[in-house]
Every structure is written in C-alpha cells, then in structure tokens.
Amino acid sequence: MRVGFIPLTDCAPLAIAAAKGFDQKYGITLVASKEASWAAVRDKLVAGELDAAHILYGLLYGLELGIASKPQAMANLMTLNRNGQAITLSSELQEKGVTDLGGLKRLIDRSAPGSYTFAHTFPTGTHAMWLYYWLASAGIDPFNDVRTVVVPPPQMVMNMRIGNMSGFCVGEPWNARAINDRIGFTAATSQDIWPEHPEKVLGTRRDWVERNPNTARALVAALMEAQRWIAASPENTRETARLLARRGWLNTKEQYLTGRMLGEYDNGLGRRWQDAHPMRFWAGGEVSFPWLSDGMWFLTQFRRWGLLKQAPDYLAVASRINRIDVWQAAAQAVGGISAPAVRMRSSTLMDGTVWNGSDPEGYARHFSIQRKGA
C-alpha cells in the first residue's frame, strides 16, 4: 500500500506502523511516500498514485465538495491525531511590542489593511481554519485586515526568516524550529483555540474503499496499533521522535520533536508549561474515532469564510465521508476498543462558543466576522 504523508510530527502513526510491523500483522505492507505539499497529496490521491494519505481534515471535505477543484468522492477512515499545531509570530512583530493576540490586534488597527502577511498550509485545511478563527476572535478580519498566503509546511521557517510573512499556522516541528532559530515565538497552540480538536486524518477515495474493504480495515487496524504503541509510555513517545527525525521521515533534529510530543512547551518568550491538551494519538482509541460533528465543524467554517455559497446538508456530507463502519471493523480486529455510543461530541472553543453539531447552519451564521458574500 502506498500511503502519502507530509513531513510533520503527526505522521507518526504511519512511521510506527511500518517500523514495528503492525502493517504486516494485518497482512499489508505500508509503503510511505513523502510529499512536498498538501496540493501534491491531493493530486496524487485523486489520480490513484496514492492509495491513502495522512491528510488535513478540511482538505478531504473540500475535495468532496469540489471547492476549487473537481468534486471527488472521499472517505475519512480515522482521525490520526488531535491537537499539536500552533501559530508562530515573527520576532519582528515582537520588536514592535506584539507578544499576544491583543497586541497583534492593536498593531493591525493602526496599520493599513494588508500590511501584514500570515501563512497557512492549504485553503480548506485545518491550519487555515485555526488561523482564521484565532484572528477573528480578536476582531481581526483574515480576509480584509491582513493578507493570507499558502506555504507548504517545510518552507514556513525559511519564508519567515527572509521576511515573507509576519506569522504562520502549521504543524510541528516547524513552530519549535522557529523558536530554536530565534526568528519567532508561539503565540497560540491549536489546542488553545479548540481543546482536543481533530487534526490529520487517514484519507482515501470512496471508490478505493469499496474495491478494497478488507485492505481498508487492515490499514486502519495497523494504524490504531501504532497510535496505541506511541501513547503507551513516554519512552515510546521518545523513540517515535527519534524515528521521525530520520532522513526518510522528517529529516530534522530530534530536539525539535520530543518536547512538544511529550506536551512540554516553551513559547520562546520565557514561558514554559506542561500542556493539558498535547498532541494526542490514542486516549483509549477515542482519538481515532471519526466523529460526525468533527467533520461538520469544518463545513461550518467553509460557510463562514465564503468557501460554500449554499448551506450543505451537513449531517449527510459527514455521514458519507466519515466511514464509521470501517473504523468499527478495524476496532473489532484490534480488540479492547469501545465505539462511542453517540456520533457527535461537544466542544467549547476559545471564544466560549459551544459546538455540538446540533444546529450547524445557525452556528456557521452566528459569527460577527464572516467573509463578505458568504
């Protein structure tokens, strides 16, 4: 099986499944394919060059709905991780007195619109949604007050170093790397925005699942085993970091990976803490469950930011993409994993808004800052 990934910490389940033989246990061989950008992952997945991929949650939903591309029937087989992304602001902003979101708001208020550029990794991706939500929570319109651009994750630090952006939202290890290189600081983690949010998923095409149901189940089972192994002990997490640092995976220094994988944070401004919501892979198997409300949340944000001009059938879209049936079959094969009794979960985001999937269109339209024409 050829499975694509972007060199980010949260591709860890793929690395461990291959290294520890969990793929072989379920009768498959996982061949990991490192890709340069999320656009490359999308194109190869659609073309059939990849069987499946470590992919941004929102990217999968954007593909299904044909946002900026031809619609493609997609499937989310499992969530690979929660939490663990961040927003980095540049040292240049710090020199202007910005150390938090409030300071950024004050600077932008006294500047011409579009004076500052912020990067994310894909227009419908998780990082775009975290960045937009964070900015808007302080009254900063991400489409009018600032400029936003798309940059592949491995290129974020380089682009900040040469002054192409004032901030970015990306996965690890690039936020930790920016601090190490003294070019930026962590202004917020993604779990500050939404504690226990979904992040990367195992994505594929629906026709592939229909043709290969047993292989799909085996792949999910192997990755569940890998998730469980990573979370079993701090030493397993450290070993995972050592593996990910190798050339075939992230090709970086172990020190950029280990701390934040263990929930040990340093924001680059002197604050250190043990995060209550670190990058999470297991939690008794609950992390991997493809909650319908998680997928529906991304649809609400597509509506908010004008990516969907008409209200979708939120529940129907999530129900056809999130393959709970495949997850259940894999969980049974692995053993010791109980499926949640419900398909929705409730979360409270940074602005106090509760999301539980009960009124998605009302939720999408209640925000004071929305993209004009949405």
Give the ranges of each region predicted by the language model.
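Short, glycine-/small- and polar/acidic-enriched structural segments
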Residues: 1-149, 164-176, 183-196, 348-362
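Conserved C-terminal helix/tail region of periplasmic/extracytoplasmic solute-binding proteins
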Residues: 296-374
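Solvent-exposed, acidic/flexible segments
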Residues: 34, 38, 80, 124, ...
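Ligand-binding pocket segment of bilobal, Venus flytrap-like solute-binding proteins
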Residues: 50-51, 151-186, 205, 242, ...
